[in-house]
């Protein structure tokens, strides 16, 4: 069951969409790390700023690319949004574009870079510009969401999800309560939401997050997880 409502008063005058998402019908609830029943963990989930490869619609995956000028401006905007938030910890992947975004946005908290939060290795498609060749694009679109397909020497969704879950388990053991920031990647963040919200592959594959969009997930407290998506005033037309 999903409920949606508008919430005001977010960081820097942003507007949030609140999605209250329960476990899928018939699903078995997963046990969180041991914590008091009233403990709540708030996870701010950002995507890294834009890179040249993002602008070119090129699959960068495990390639270690850096922010471009637009990406640095997006990271500065993220810092402004988060200016009033105290973080107990900040996590990034160990790819430069994620670390650079976290360094600009973190507000002085040391950054813990985890390889398990890295983007998926897209195998034979890494570096491919989606749409540049119709046959290759069709093959990629056909294969990318199949959970067991490693894309010819890359990484399957199942393998990627296993390491993302491993990262989250460690993070939640270290922080059963409090407020943390994770700066990840487009697909990595899909899988973080899949794990925290108990989503199916179909539902998690449908999630999109632009380079300048921010989620906040609240887990614990003896209730179903809740998800907010902050959208800056200039993006309200997209609602």
Task: State where each predicted segment sits.
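Bacterial N-terminal signal peptides
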Residues: 11-22
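Glycine-rich phosphate-binding loop signature in dinucleotide/nucleotide-binding domains
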Residues: 84-85, 171-178
